[in-house]
Amino acid sequence: MQPRKPQQIARELALLSLSQLPVNPKKLDTLLDDQLVSKLVLGAVRTLTSEVQDTLNNAAGELQRSNDRLLSSQTRASDLNSARTMLQEAIACTQTAINQLGTAVDFPELIQLANQDKGVRNYAKELVITVNENRHIIDELLSTALVDWQVTRLAQLDRDILQIAVAEMKFLGVPDSIAINEAVELAKRYSGDDGHRFINGVLRRVTEQKKTA
């Protein structure tokens, strides 16, 4: 695996800490470097912990429903198929949780680079501030790009990935193709099985709408 660039590390820190940091940009902008790093890392840990716990709870729920269906059925084909589907959902949820836990091995690198590389922490801060300052505009762009869906109904990490990508494209001058590719890579690490395809599709529609606006 190739070493990740400072901006890639910054995006990951911003993604994992976005929902945990102060919404008021002024509060974040006044933090000293060591305070900023501490808040970024703590926010990342809390987000990842919450995501893994929720995913495992979903897996446990699907397993229980599958088990209940098997115990109460009379081995009808429809019941067996339903139980099989629930079991597959549980396996998928468990795999997602395992993948999310696997990213924890990168935390020492995140912490070290955030401490040593000013560019990492500054870009992470810029991303969080830009999203919070322009959240209404960003969410409007996403709402028009979502098909039969609402921004508020998206999974937290999916929503944050999309918001960061749109912030980069619209406000930070990042080329659309780079912002989309980086968002897709984040989705592969932190979203569900088809999350990266969903993220890619939404962001492609955002760029198409920008061209016709």
From Swiss-Prot:
One of its GO terms (molecular function) is RNA binding. GO terms for cellular component: cytosol. InterPro entries: NusB-like_sf (IPR035926), NusB_fam (IPR011605), NusB_RsmB_TIM44 (IPR006027). Pfam families: NusB. Gene3D superfamilies: NusB-like. GO terms for biological process: DNA-templated transcription termination; transcription antitermination. CDD domains: Terminator_NusB. Involved in transcription antitermination. Required for transcription of ribosomal RNA (rRNA) genes. Binds specifically to the boxA antiterminator sequence of the ribosomal RNA (rrn) operons. PANTHER family: ANTITERMINATION NUSB DOMAIN-CONTAINING PROTEIN (PTHR11078:SF3), N UTILIZATION SUBSTANCE PROTEIN B-RELATED (PTHR11078). Belongs to the NusB family. This is Transcription antitermination protein NusB. It comes from Nostoc punctiforme (strain ATCC 29133 / PCC 73102). The lineage of its organism: Bacteria, Bacillati, Cyanobacteriota, Cyanophyceae, Nostocales. The gene is nusB.
